[in-house]
Design a protein with these regions (language model features):
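Conserved mixed alpha/beta catalytic, RNA-binding, or beta-rich assembly cores of soluble enzyme
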Residues: 15-68
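C-terminal binding/interaction regions
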Residues: 1-26, 63, 68-110
């Protein structure tokens, strides 16, 4: 299992992996992010039979961060998700893509 060299990046990968296990109705995806003050936010995906009531892990983590006042981000970690939703809020921010076992498969800047 590879891990990010930066301990703070490793922390958000771990947070995303842990959040993924709390997904509903089943583990699907987890996300975590770190804002420019060092605060971290994590969320799991939440499914529902009505797609309008479902949310992705990334949306949940971003909603928690933005509703707490965060507007700038240092890094994102995604487990079983894609970085498409990051385009607006994360320009120039590193994204750590990880498999469910925590293997970081890509590091990119959106």
């Amino acid at each position: 299992v590879s891990a990010p060299a930066d301990p703070e990046d490793a922390k958000i990968v771990t947070l995303a992996r842990t959040a993924r296990t709390r997904g509903y109705p089943a583990p699907d995806e987890g996300a975590a992010l770190r804002d420019d003050t060092g605060r971290t936010y994590a969320a799991a995906s939440v499914g529902h039979r009505d797609p309008a009531l479902a949310t992705s892990a990334l949306r949940g983590a971003l909603a928690a961060a933005v509703s707490s006042g965060a507007r700038r981000f240092e890094a994102f970690a995604l487990v079983a998700a894609t970085p498409a939703l990051l385009a607006e809020l994360a320009v120039g921010t590193p994204v750590l893509l990880a498999t469910p076992d925590g293997t970081v498969v890509a590091t990119d800047v959106v």
